[in-house]
UniProtKB/Swiss-Prot annotation:
EC assignment: 6.1.1.10
Protein localization: Cytoplasm
Family: Belongs to the class-I aminoacyl-tRNA synthetase family. MetG type 1 subfamily.
GO MF, one annotated term: methionine-tRNA ligase activity
Keywords: Aminoacyl-tRNA synthetase, ATP-binding, Cytoplasm, Ligase, Metal-binding, Nucleotide-binding, Protein biosynthesis, RNA-binding, tRNA-binding, Zinc
Reactions performed catalytically: tRNA(Met) + L-methionine + ATP = L-methionyl-tRNA(Met) + AMP + diphosphate
InterPro entries named among the record's database cross-references: aa-tRNA-synth_I_CS, Anticodon_Met, Met-tRNA-synth_bsu_C, Met-tRNA_ligase_1, Met-tRNA_synth, Methionyl/Leucyl_tRNA_Synth, MetRS_core, MetRS_Zn
'KMSKS' region, short sequence motif: residues: 332-336
Source organism of this protein record: Photorhabdus laumondii subsp. laumondii (strain DSM 15139 / CIP 105565 / TT01)
One CC-aspect GO term: cytosol
Biological role: Is required not only for elongation of protein synthesis but also for the initiation of all mRNA translation through initiator tRNA(fMet) aminoacylation.
Protein name per Swiss-Prot or TrEMBL: Methionine--tRNA ligase
Binding site for Zn(2+): 146, 149, 159, 162
Length: 675
């Protein structure tokens, strides 16, 4: 009896519905999509779903600021998010919203089951209240210093520096993030999920292989510090689902948000009619459930979520796959620098496959951060996709189309080399399955190098000029095209749009099992350009378009207004200036000048004479003697009527009596270069 193939349900974390998708979000959705596409190519039944996280105070307040209903705002955002993911070829079977009938039904059901099973506790608490806005403040709307590590400007539920969780009342120097007012303490009744009751189950589950080792180790710290009951209540006004039999009380967004996975799948089941919800979510489900998430929401997905499922009679996730953050050019994404790039802005300038490839080339199964270095991005895409892969097709297709009417040879020119490519499929498949995408890409590019070396050695452009060698030419070029086909099959999960164009050229579908049989005596289509090289100008234009536009520029005051920053120079221009630490050995008035002082500067073995216009600020020049300063040492000597000035000392200030000679920190020595 044959074994029944596993069925997979895969999710990404739900984007919050109060803003656009950016390239940080896209890392996760691309990672998951590559994995899903690979599983589908291997014959697995995969259902891939997501939704917008559409509840909470931030959405309520933003809608108020916009003068529209929250429902209207989240509907618009949902459409935009769906459009962005489609533009990046993310192959969701369903993209829904947590503000849905399915999600409300499931949230209510799970809450009532938890309550029936004794896992919901209610008690009166003291909570922070904004006296200006007349509202209780949810934890994300209180800021202050972390009670554990003392980091400033942290939210009221968890610290982004040390990862600790706590209640808003534990914050040091709390303030309302809504109005800035100092909050007051008021009493209110709240409902709590009894998370500590699931401690033993959670400790076993986290060590079962459901989490990466890095994550499981971090969770052990949380277990050792003790789990706390989880407040699942928010007071009106609040945009979300009202708790049954508790007027004016609402489910905290983090209760119904993960249930949104279930709600989106229920919506898909209702649409298709041939999917069974319980087959994937029931306690005895044999299907696999995978969540792709960022490391910032591990606490919710590895503690609250599995405990909620366990306590309400549902199955737990098979695996939670955690990834790191995205930086751009080695730094946090910045609107002012133009590196906070929206998905839609990227798509206005560049091909989605480019980013998919670059992320894949850097992703592993670890939770390390990924840096999107824009110069490296251009170089790698052009080098790998254009020069190594697409060029392999173009340099052979011309001969096949022109000389042989698009017909490939009836036998392989180098069966051993082709078999080497086929043998590589096993390792590449293992790397894709294990989410070690960067390793898979390295294996694929190593094969691409072999393919191009074969073509270089066979030199079809030379063979084409030799009489009587048509059969050799056809065989060589057919071999190159067959190797291109194998490479594109391996890359199909990563580059779906390019793969589609390659399939049109090859006149065949790219399937994992299909590469066992090469294309022999096969008709290919006329070759059309498959992929465009990235122009750095397009990347620069994308960055410019991403810079935050300020409709009403802030009025600049102070020194910057009086002396604006000059035009940008290159690093090479700056590097030409040689600044050195100098010791003022002697300082004197200059006879005949009421502005200049004559300074004798020791550069640690060389003495320079410099005339400087700082007399008005230093009426006693002898007070400068023995002091260290900074001078431009490679400035061309300037002949003055008082003598030759052999450099320039550095000073700040607008002039007159407001001139301030610059000095290095203690420890600097004469002659040291300033870099």
């Amino acid at each position: 009896m044959s074994q029944v193939a596993k069925k997979l349900l895969v999710t990404c974390a739900l984007p919050y519905a109060n803003g656009p998708i950016h390239l940080g979000h896209m890392l996760e959705h691309i990672q998951a999509d590559i994995w899903v596409r690979f599983q589908r190519m291997r014959g697995k039944e995969v259902h891939f779903i997501c939704a917008d996280d559409a509840h909470g105070t931030p959405i309520m307040l933003k809608a108020q600021q916009m003068g529209i209903a929250p429902e209207e705002m989240i509907a618009t955002v949902n459409q935009e998010h769906h459009q962005d993911f489609t533009g990046f070829s993310v192959s969701y079977d369903n993209y829904h919203s947590t503000h849905s009938e399915e999600n409300q039904t499931l949230s209510t059901k799970i809450y009532l089951e938890l309550k029936k099973n004794g896992h919901i506790k209610n008690r009166t608490i003291s909570q922070l209240y904004d006296p200006e806005k007349n509202m209780f403040l949810p934890d994300r709307f209180v800021k202050g210093s972390c009670p554990k590590c003392k980091a400033e400007d942290q939210y009221g539920d968890n610290c982004e520096v040390c990862g600790s969780t706590y209640s808003p009342t534990e914050l040091i120097n709390p303030r309302s993030a809504v109005s800035g007012a100092t909050p007051e303490m008021r009493e209110t009744e709240h409902f709590f999920f009894d998370l500590p009751a699931f401690s033993d189950m959670l400790q076993a589950w986290t060590r079962s292989g459901a989490l990466q080792e890095q994550v499981a180790n971090k969770m052990q710290e949380w277990f050792e510090s003790g789990l706390q009951q989880w407040d699942i209540t928010r007071d009106a006004p609040y945009f979300g689902f009202e708790i049954p039999d508790a007027p004016g009380k609402y489910f905290y967004v983090w209760l119904d948000a993960p249930i949104g996975y279930m709600g989106s799948f229920q919506n898909l089941c209702d649409k298709r009619g041939n999917l069974n919800f319980d087959e994937f979510w029931a306690k005895d489900s044999t299907a696999d459930l995978y969540h792709f998430i960022g490391k910032d929401i591990v606490y919710f997905h590895s503690l609250f979520w599995p405990a909620m499922l366990e306590g309400s009679g549902y199955r737990k996730p098979t695996n939670v796959f955690v990834h790191g953050y995205v930086t751009v050019n080695g730094a946090k994404m910045s609107k002012s620098r133009g590196t906070f790039i929206k998905a839609s802005t990227y798509l206005d300038h560049l091909d989605a496959d480019c980013l998919r490839y670059y992320y894949a080339a850097k992703l592993s199964a670890r939770i390390d951060d990924i840096d999107l270095n824009l110069e490296d991005f251009v170089q790698r895409v052009n080098s790998d996709i254009v020069n190594k892969v697409v060029n392999l097709a173009s340099r052979n297709a011309g001969f096949i189309n022109k000389r042989f009417n698009g017909k490939l040879a009836d036998k392989l020119a180098d069966p051993a080399l082709y078999q080497q490519f086929i043998d590589g499929a096993k390792v590449i498949a293992e790397e894709f399955n294990n989410r070690e995408f960067s390793k898979a890409i390295r294996e694929i590019m190593a094969l691409a190098d072999l393919a191009n070396r074969y073509v270089d050695e066979q030199a079809p452009w030379v063979v084409a000029k030799e009489e009587g060698r048509d059969a050799d030419l056809q065989a060589i070029c057919s071999m190159g095209i067959n190797l291109f086909r194998v490479l594109m099959t391996f890359l199909k999960p990563v580059l779906p749009s390019l793969a589609e164009r390659a399939e049109a050229f090859l006149n065949t579908e790219l399937t994992w099992h299909g590469i066992e049989q090469p294309l022999l005596d096969h008709q290919v289509s006329a070759f059309k350009a498959l992929f465009n090289r990235i122009d750095m100008d397009k990347v620069d234009a994308m960055v410019v378009a991403s810079k935050e536009s300020i409709n009403t520029p802030q009025k600049v005051s102070g020194p910057l207004a009086e002396d604006p920053i000059q035009d940008t120079i290159t690093f090479d221009d700056f590097a030409k200036v040689d600044m050195r630490v100098a010791l003022i050995k002697q300082a004197d008035f200059v006879e005949g000048s009421d502005k200049l002082l004559k300074l004798m500067l020791d550069l640690g073995g060389e003495t320079r004479q410099v005339f400087s216009g700082i007399r008005s600020s230093y009426p006693d020049p002898k007070a400068l003697e023995g002091r260290l300063t900074i001078m431009v040492a490679n400035l061309a000597p300037r002949k003055m009527r008082f003598g030759i000035s052999e450099g320039m000392v550095m000073a700040a200030g607008p002039g007159g009596k407001d001139i301030f000679l610059l000095s290095p920190d203690s420890g600097a020595q004469p002659g040291m270069q300033v870099k």
